[in-house]
């Protein structure tokens, strides 16, 4: 395989790309809400995203194939161990309220990946990922907690109408950002997962996503945020959503769609110059 292709594959599969996206959104939060952009919080978001995503993606695989790891998987495991160690170390620098946000997010991620042993009426021995209709909302909640709740709590900022609306905006943005992934996976997801494209169909999923994008832009305008970065990013997201179908390549969503938070970050950074 081409060395550059190997590096790119590792970059995507090791969750470095998604970690950069989460870190970019955290920085966007700090800038738009005029919070102190702390390096420890940004570092924690980056490292913990790598840890959480790789744990969710590879925990079962590592258990089954622990004697036959590929070279890439070995490197991903070592990267995840280092990222986890840095995450734990950086947690000690957080305010107590921010540490609580990390704890709640960590518990949700754990329950998302690991089936619960007891047969609770709701989980019935499953993980949260397997609960019908819940997957995308769990992802939206955790991303909102990490990219909005964490910087707010570490700056000891009280919650008001502005913070609530901003958090709701981020939640909706993440939901729409996940739709191209759900559309891509329509052919593979079991019907019992009840993803939004399975429930609404392709056309109405795109309509719902467009409405969500309209809400995101409206909130930014209402809160008098920088207009060009959010408008450009969400127009690109709308284009990606309209272009999405189950036949699109893996890299379309895993790289290009996932890069949109970084576009927001770059545009907002340029607007500050």
Range-by-range predicted roles:
Residues 36-40, 46, 82-122, 209-252:
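Transmembrane helix-loop-helix
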Residues 19-24, 80-86, 138-150, 206-217, ...:
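Core segments of transmembrane alpha-helices
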Residues 2-18, 58-79, 114-141, 193-195, ...:
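Interhelical loop and helix-boundary elements at the membrane-water interface
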Residues 37-50, 69-74:
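Loop-to-helix transition at the N-terminal end of transmembrane alpha-helices
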Residues 9-18, 24-26, 39, 43, ...:
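Hydrophobic alpha-helical transmembrane segments of membrane proteins
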């Amino acid at each position: 395989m081409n060395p550059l292709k190997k590096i790119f594959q590792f970059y995507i599969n090791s969750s470095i790309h998604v970690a950069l996206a989460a870190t970019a959104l955290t920085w966007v939060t700090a800038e738009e809400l005029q919070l102190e952009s702390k390096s420890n919080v940004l570092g924690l978001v980056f490292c913990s995203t790598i840890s959480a995503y790789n744990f969710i993606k590879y925990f079962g695989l590592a258990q089954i194939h622990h004697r036959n790891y590929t070279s890439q998987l070995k490197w991903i495991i070592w990267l995840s161990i280092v990222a986890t160690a840095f995450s734990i170390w950086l947690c000690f620098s957080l305010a107590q309220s921010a540490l609580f946000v990390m704890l709640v997010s960590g518990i949700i991620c754990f329950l998302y990946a690991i089936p619960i042993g007891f047969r609770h009426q709701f989980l019935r021995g499953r993980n949260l990922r397997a609960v019908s209709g819940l997957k995308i909302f769990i992802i939206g909640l955790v991303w909102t907690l990490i990219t909005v709740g964490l910087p707010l709590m570490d700056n000891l900022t009280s919650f008001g109408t502005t913070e609530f609306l901003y958090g709701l905006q981020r939640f909706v943005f993440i939901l729409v950002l996940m739709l191209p992934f759900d559309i891509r996976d329509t052919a593979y997801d079991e019907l019992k997962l009840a993803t939004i494209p399975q429930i609404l169909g392709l056309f109405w999923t795109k309509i719902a996503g467009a409405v969500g994008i309209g809400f995101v832009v409206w909130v930014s305008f209402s809160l008098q945020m920088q207009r060009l970065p959010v408008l450009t990013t969400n127009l690109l997201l709308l284009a990606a959503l309209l272009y999405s179908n189950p036949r699109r390549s893996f890299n379309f969503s895993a790289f290009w769609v996932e890069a949109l938070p970084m576009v927001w970050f770059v545009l907002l950074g340029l607007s500050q110059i």
